[in-house]
Structures are given as C-alpha cells and as structure tokens.
Amino acid sequence: EQYMVAFWM
C-alpha cells in the first residue's frame, strides 16, 4: 500500500 502514503502527501 505504498500508493496510499503518496496519496496523502
């Protein structure tokens, strides 16, 4: 779920 972390940024 790396895309999730990038989504918040």
From Swiss-Prot:
Chief place of localization: secreted
Subcellular location as annotated: Secreted
A GO molecular-function annotation: ion channel regulator activity
Tissue specificity: Expressed by the venom gland.
Residues where Methionine amide is found: M9
Its job: Peptide with unknown natural function. Has neuroprotective activity since is shows potent antiseizure effects in acute (kainic acid (KA) and pentylenetetrazole (PTZ)) and chronic (temporal lobe epilepsy model induced by pilocarpine) epileptic models. Protects against the KA-induced seizures after intraperitoneal injection in a dose-dependent manner, indicating that the peptide can cross the blood-brain barrier. Is more efficient in the KA-induced than in the PKZ-induced seizures. Does not adversely affect motor and cognitive behavior.
Subunit composition and interactions: Monomer.
Protein name in the entry: Occidentalin-1202
Organism of origin: Polybia occidentalis
